Amino acid sequence: MALTNEEILNAVAEKTVLELVELISAFEEKFNVSAAAVAVAAGPAAAAVEEQTEFNVELTSFGANKVAVIKAVREATGLGLKEAKDLVEGAPQVLKEGISKEEGEELKKKLEEAGATVTLK
């Protein structure tokens, strides 16, 4: 005589919490499974990473054309010749901090055209 799903549900509904815990343990042993909650893979909503809005432009190296890079740094930062030269020769150095992505990309492009190696962080 096979039990219907309805009969099984009624039998489970009549049990106490302690009896249900024992029943679950018996199922785990009999079928060699675990009743632990399965971790659900994080979806896009769960991984709501805040997009970076402020960037730093770092001069990594000045490359082969140091004079052109110094001119580009002076133009971008408004520094004097000596300060710009010291900054370029002291690479890696942060040229600008807390700027927008667009401004950072534009500055990076100008410096790379002058021969520098630049990173946007």
Curated annotation (Swiss-Prot):
UniProt-recorded Gene Ontology molecular function terms: mRNA binding; structural constituent of ribosome
A Pfam family that the UniProt record links to this protein: Ribosomal_L12
Stored SUPFAM superfamilies: ClpS-like, Ribosomal protein L7/12, oligomerisation (N-terminal) domain
A cellular component term, taken from the record's GO annotations: cytosolic large ribosomal subunit
GO biological process, one term: translation
InterPro entries reported in the protein's UniProt record: Ribosomal_bL12, Ribosomal_bL12_C, Ribosomal_bL12_C/ClpS-like, Ribosomal_bL12_oligo, Ribosomal_bL12_oligo_N_sf
Keywords: Ribonucleoprotein, Ribosomal protein
The family this protein is said to belong to: Belongs to the bacterial ribosomal protein bL12 family.
PANTHER family, per database record: 39S RIBOSOMAL PROTEIN L12, LARGE RIBOSOMAL SUBUNIT PROTEIN BL12M
Oligomer status and interactors: Homodimer. Part of the ribosomal stalk of the 50S ribosomal subunit. Forms a multimeric L10(L12)X complex, where L10 forms an elongated spine to which 2 to 4 L12 dimers bind in a sequential fashion. Binds GTP-bound translation factors.
Entry-linked NCBIfam families: L12
Function: Forms part of the ribosomal stalk which helps the ribosome interact with GTP-bound translation factors. Is thus essential for accurate translation.
Stated name of the protein: Large ribosomal subunit protein bL12
Organism ancestry: Bacteria, Pseudomonadati, Pseudomonadota, Gammaproteobacteria, Moraxellales
